[in-house]
Amino acid sequence: MNRLWKITAVEWKLINREFITLFFALIFPVLMLLLFGTIYGNRPSEIMGGYGTVDVSTPAYTNMIIAVTGLMSFPLTLAQYREKKILRRFMVTPVKPVEILLSQFFVNILMTVLGLVVLIALGKVVFDLHFYGNVLEAIVAFIVILLGIFSIGLFIGGLSKNMK
């Protein structure tokens, strides 16, 4: 277990070097929120069913973060490891390929959660974001969506021979 956390720490450092993942998981959703929040504000309107524009669009931005990490970052990293034969090199070490996959899974989940925290905190501070649902149901939905998207990403990464 200790080895898994060490691998995860190394993978975390590696994912923070990838500009595309950082941009689309952390910066782009925040820019979208700031852009459309500044244009439309968060006043309740009849068009939005009595909710504010930021209140309605933030769940879409959260799903965008999940999709970027699960369908872009996760499978591309797995394909890159296959292309560069990194997983094959780990076969001669005590590290198991499952530990590499789990560490990638944990790192991408951490990036997703970090992106969501930044997005929701900024939405609350800048636009007074409201949540009109049950927190437990939202967490369960988040986990189900996360597992579904990451399963698709693992499938794509497993089929890909290279990053192209």
Model-derived features: positions:
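Short helix-to-coil transition segments within interhelical loops
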Residues: R89-K96
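Transmembrane helix-boundary elements of multi-pass transport/secretion proteins
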Residues: R3, I7-K84, V98, Q104-L116, ...
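Residues within well-ordered alpha helices
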Residues: R89, A121-G123
